[in-house]
Every structure is written in C-alpha cells, then in structure tokens.
Amino acid sequence: VQPVAAPALFEEGPWIDELADPEEIFTDRIDDTDNAREHIQTLAPDLIVGSSFVADDQRYPLLSDIAPTVTFEDAAGDTPAGSWETVTTLLGTVTGRGERATEIIEETHAAIEQAAADHPVPDGATVTFAGRYAADQVIAAVNDDHSGLRFLSALGLGVADLSGEGASVAGGRAELSLENLDLLDRADLVIMGDFGGDLQEDLESQSLYQSLDAVREDRVVVLDLALTTALNTPTPLNIPPLIEELGPVLDRLAA
C-alpha cells in the first residue's frame, strides 16, 4: 500500500523513518480548507483513511464519493481514533492483510506485557496525561476510554481522579484553570504533552507549576510533540518508542 498524502498538520514521528523516507511516503499534504476535497480528488486514491472527524454527515459523503472511505471512532468519542487494536484490524481487513494485522497486534501486546514486567510500578500507582492547550487552560484525560490511558493502564497504572471543585469534566477530559493546577498532584505520575509553541515552556516558568509536589519530586515527564501525538493515538509503530521513553520514568516510581 502506497500512501500518497496526509493532513498538513500530521505529525509522522521518527518511527516512520524505519519504514521509508517520509518525504517519499507523503508526497502531498492536505490542508483543511474548502479546496481539500478537490486536492484529494486529483490524487485519485484507491482508499481514504480518516479519523472520526470526517465521519460526520457533511464530510463523509464528499470523501466516499471519491474512493472507499474508512474512519475510526472511539466508543466514548474521546479521541480521533479508536483503539489501536481496532484500527489495526480494520486496516488489515481493507488492505487484504488481516493475518498480518493479527500478528502485529499479538506482537505489540507482547511488547507491552514485557514492558510491564520489566518496569513494575507500585500497586495503586496512578497517572494523568495532560497538556496546555490554551494560555489559561490545561486539559487532562480522566478515564481509560482514552486510547493513551488504556495503553498506560496496560503498563499497570491507574487513572488519577481529577474530578471535583476546580475541574470541569466532560467528554472524558478535565479542563483545569491554571489556578487549579494543584489537582495534578493527585497523580503519582504526571505526563505532560508539549503541543508546540511556548505554552509548555511558559507553564514551567510559573510558580504554581514549580510548587507542585510532582514537579519537585521529579514525577513529571514532558513529551515532545511527536510522542504527545503518539500517546494521544497509540499505534503498533509508536508504542515501542513510548515504552522506551516511559520505562525509566516508571522505574522512578518504583524506587
């Protein structure tokens, strides 16, 4: 299967380099504009793979009129992709590689199980996965309907409870004002996603953030944009780099 295009904002991650040159794989980038459909049509794809964002009544008919279109949707609607197992199975089916998809799922499960054995965490240890999406707001995933938290749960971590005063919880996420950052201290491990720009750097300069027990006790890990994207939507390709990054962090919890 030869990919011909990807969204303009698609963060492919260094793990794709192991397969091929990303510039050769993604020869076109699609902007989310009124001309996107025409751009896709000129590429004459045999298959269109989209997130749940293209599954609405307006976008889906426009794309499926060009080529067969498959989308992924989390059961809770909390992420733009379903579980990585579901995604892998579906892609294996539509490309005629179902057996290989099953093998990949089994291999990835084995890698996760090995990581959990190599980096055991204390019973009851909890995690939160958060990111500063706006100048005045941090958003944290709060249940394991989120694909990334399901992966972290498989490593033995529970999901920290951030509900209560100071957190607006909806759609599987908690919106925290900067004044309520101390809610992050409910987690034994805080994983912060850096979504680019100066938002994370500015957050780290603020006294309230610096005063968090998790920060002072070195229980915070900040992921770059590629790994943040990976944890938001884990796949068999990006799970090994996530394990490599998070393994030493899990070891610190057990120390």
Predicted regions and their residues:
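A short, structured surface patch at a secondary-structure boundary
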Residues: 1-41, 48, 52
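Extracytoplasmic ligand-binding site segments that recognize negatively charged/polar headgroups
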Residues: 11-14, 56-58, 73-90, 124-150, ...
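Ligand-binding pocket segment of bilobal, Venus flytrap-like solute-binding proteins
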Residues: 118-119, 123, 132-135, 139, ...
